[in-house]
Amino acid sequence: MLANQPDHQIDKQDRIRAAVEKNPRKMTLQLACDLGVPEVEVIRAFPADRVTELDVGRWEELLRSLEPFGAVRVLVSNGAATIEVDGQFGGFSTTGEFFNVQTDSLDMHIRWRELGAVFAVEKPGHMNGMATRSIQFFDQTGAAAFKVFLNFGGPIAPESETRFAELRAKFKCSVSGQMAHQLR
């Protein structure tokens, strides 16, 4: 923890870390709601071996690097609903403020200027505890923009595990999240 952080901030971070440790399988959105914090703060509280902050400034290259994974599960949530879609990244284009992903199985229009953080996450699944691998994008308020699960409820294919590790190393953020956000 940083010496120049106010005590209430350190207490909040400790509270979030304790909740993550106590409930490793709980959905991060639910933990964030329970704790009254943005979901990105829950992700940042994960143990270092389970989360890597990626360089959000390289968002387009990162999104394009998801195509070789083949079929993935994309989750998008807002205050009223969550949608889960199985599809493949590809068909990339830019129109106005949108970066588009348009394939036969996935149709996304991403307001890339709103992206604030992105992470490579390893987490026990909330349903069966099986380890999941995901790339999770957050907006500038700390809410999840969308999450891309490389496996969901089943084992990850060995080649996807290798690609995930390579992606995590290639896009790893060289500055802490809050600083990276301020530098953009």
Report each predicted region and the residues it spans.
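Eukaryotic intrinsically disordered, low-complexity regulatory linkers and tails enriched in Ser/Thr/Pro
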Residues: 1-184
